[in-house]
């Protein structure tokens, strides 16, 4: 069972309130080794992913894809995430997250190699399939480490701190990408391709790092004995309002796969005529809010509840999309990028809340189940965005996203607050 020692937890929060750099170091240093090693692993992985994130839609289009084909490619690429989501959660519970991290990094390495060697947009589909497979495995395993190593009352704070520290490389990677793209020829295939070769080298180094340094979290030592189907039934028997939560998370994930990964950078480049440095600046700007507010918002979520923080962060993210649509210059695009960072803050809070809706031993299955539905969103969202872009107009993509986020907030009203309770075992 999770410890509930109130006084030490209050002290942890006070430690993070003053002299934040020193206190953050103390907070991290007293955590278990798997938590600290995972932070370094995620920081490296995040750097490599954000190196190409803003430029990937432009790269695929430069290989010959139209706006609709861009959506189709990303949608097909999401099939692997759907196929692997539930088994990965179950395997993480049964065999541990270390093996999942190794497989995930290997898949992302191979996906990066396929991107680097692609000569047409159709080849990119295979790269997306394999890369998304690795990303799905990583996304499922990573929060299990935090859920296993952090105490209940400090979870949102700890996850916010983890998000802050691992996001720091994301401040420099888009700028590095912009410099390299400019050096190698601009926003075209030859200019963007070298970034994927850098990913190949980087993921190779992370793979070695996991092999040498990562050990299984102690609290994950429990092995499940039931079969796959029985274990999923157990999840819904012992979880709290999981059906409503899964629907909420699915709606909340649409911006990532329709906007952030596909149509925000494509819209900025094609409609607003943003160059490589503006695209990179938007990506860098999106990390400003996570870096400055992750810890304060984590503490706030621990104190006043996760739901209120989610209402706030989701609303500001919707405002960022309106700024993007109505931007008349690069300054407005950069401001939109700053506010888009609130989607990252919302995802951290959702992760903390997810970990409190099920018993600790079921975390792998919980995040695996969410991964299944995220995968479905990954399939449907890009092609849906492509249809909207082609049939109605580019701006309609973002109006629909805003409407769906408003709907998600109404759904959140039906969920119980989790920050002061743990593990209701009634089926809902």
Predicted regions and their residues:
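Structural signature of the two symmetry-related core transmembrane helices
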Residues: 99-114, 308-323, 402
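Helix-to-loop junctions at the C-terminal end of transmembrane segments
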Residues: 84-96, 181, 292-305, 389
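Juxtamembrane intracellular "pre-TM" segments in multi-pass secondary transporters
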Residues: 2-5, 10-35, 215-247, 428
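Symmetry-related core transmembrane helices of the 12-TM Major Facilitator Superfamily/SLC fold
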Residues: 193-211, 397-413
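Helix-loop junctions on the cytosolic side of multi-pass membrane transporters
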Residues: 209-224, 413-425
